[in-house]
Amino acid sequence: MNDKHLPDASAENPWLPLRQLTPARIALGRTGTSLPTRPQLDFQYAHAQARDAVHLPFDHASIGDGLRQRGRDSLLLHSAAADRHVYLQRPDLGRRLDEASVRRLREHAAGYDGQIDLAIVVADGLSALAVQRHTLPFLERLEEQALAEGWSLSPVVLVEQGRVAVADEIGELLRARMSVILIGERPGLSSPDSLGLYFTWAPRVGLTDAYRNCISNVRLEGLSYGMAAHRLLYLMREACRRQLSGVNLKDEAEVQSLEGDAPRTGNFLLARD
């Protein structure tokens, strides 16, 4: 049989134009009854990126250097999880500091007069890649706006093998009114470098997720640094006014559209032309 008589086994998906609107794996096409080679290889590559993001060591030195260049101090601590293997199997240990870190933080806090308004914590979480890519540019925007509010800031506390709740202990030891932790989120197949922000009013050991506000997917392909800082500042202002955070504090920040229209809130799906 000549090749010219063979039917074309490759078929494109009619949803192909929608791929420009989302990184989701849609409209991949097919070859016979299978995926084409390119989408299959892309999937395997994305899976490898996600696995690597979980096990990539936390390069805290580069973040500390970047902070020093901006005149900001940092403090390196470690959770009670001794290494990555323990961290992944014992989430509870990632939520608390080890004894040496507790002593160091107490000594540091003893030098403060009064109360810190905002404790800033950075932890590797499940994606050190996210923290290394996005921490410095995001903090530049956040700290500029926080200082404009007249709030006092702690040194940036860098935590190895840390989970979200470790910020509660840090905030309590620093006697901070508020805490925010920047942490690498669990990698997905389209987002190995997604940064999460968790904000807490009156942080203290023992709080549950119900007392925290989360802003997720901070990255170039997701929520921009400026928009994330805008939403976080709104939550912090409201927390100071209402003395609470978590499920009782909703993000109702006004958002300026890309076209420069008037600020709007609510569900964009319900907006009319």
From Swiss-Prot:
It comes from the Bacteria. It comes from Pseudomonas paraeruginosa (strain DSM 24068 / PA7) (Pseudomonas aeruginosa (strain PA7)). Keywords: Bacterial microcompartment, Cobalamin, Cobalt, Lyase. GO terms for molecular function: cobalamin binding; ethanolamine ammonia-lyase activity. The basic unit is a heterodimer which dimerizes to form tetramers. The heterotetramers trimerize; 6 large subunits form a core ring with 6 small subunits projecting outwards. Pathway: Amine and polyamine degradation; ethanolamine degradation. It catalyses: ethanolamine = acetaldehyde + NH4(+). Its cofactor is adenosylcob(III)alamin. It is found in: Bacterial microcompartment. GO terms for cellular component: ethanolamine ammonia-lyase complex; ethanolamine degradation polyhedral organelle. Binds between the large and small subunits. Adenosylcob(III)alamin binds at V164, E185, C214. The keyword Lipoprotein does not apply. GO terms for biological process: amino acid metabolic process; ethanolamine catabolic process. The lineage of its organism: Bacteria, Pseudomonadati, Pseudomonadota, Gammaproteobacteria, Pseudomonadales. This is Ethanolamine ammonia-lyase small subunit. HAMAP family: EutC. Belongs to the EutC family.
